[in-house]
């Protein structure tokens, strides 16, 4: 078998990586929640009757409301709160670090929260920066939300802009 990467210099100590368990760890679930594995859910809260698809990661401190649907390959980071009756489509990404230091901060005190209201639908591969989105909003596929959304409507583009009020 061939090894990839550089060989360790003779006498160099073997490094052991920090291993974190994957799966479902310290999650608070509401009633009738469905989770399709594999997933990586930890220290988060999932509301009643919510569906979590495969290959989803929901990080500590995130809160998902009731009757939500989180589709496969979505990433929901720390400090995200999602209201009730929301739909998060495949590959949607939530970001809490604005890179104010020029690169990844890695410091939670520099991260910012994201809050979605009720009945918000996020399209496939949309990126949501730390913003607040009001109730009854549709975000189109591939959109990048960089500013707060305070008017119910359909938004799309990069940066996302209002196409039509609801």
Labelled PLM ranges:
Residues 151, 156-159:
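Acidic, glycine-centered active-site loop in nucleotide-sugar glycosyltransferases
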């Amino acid at each position: 078998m061939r090894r990839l990467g550089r060989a360790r210099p003779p006498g160099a100590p073997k490094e052991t990586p920090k291993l974190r368990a994957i799966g479902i760890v310290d999650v608070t679930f509401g009633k009738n929640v469905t989770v399709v594995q594999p997933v990586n859910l930890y220290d988060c809260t999932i509301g009643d009757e919510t569906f979590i698809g495969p290959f989803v990661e929901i990080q500590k401190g995130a809160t998902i409301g009731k009757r939500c649907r989180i589709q496969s390959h979505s990433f929901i980071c720390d400090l995200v709160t999602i209201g009730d009756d929301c739909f998060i489509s495949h590959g949607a990404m939530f970001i809490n670090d604005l890179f104010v230091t020029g690169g990844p901060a890695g410091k939670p005190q520099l991260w910012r929260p994201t809050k979605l209201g009720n009945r918000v639908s996020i399209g496939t591969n949309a990126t949501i920066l730390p913003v607040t989105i009001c109730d009854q909003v549709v975000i189109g596929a591939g959109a990048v939300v960089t500013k707060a959304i305070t008017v119910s409507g359909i938004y799309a583009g990069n940066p996302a802009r209002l196409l039509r009020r609801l």
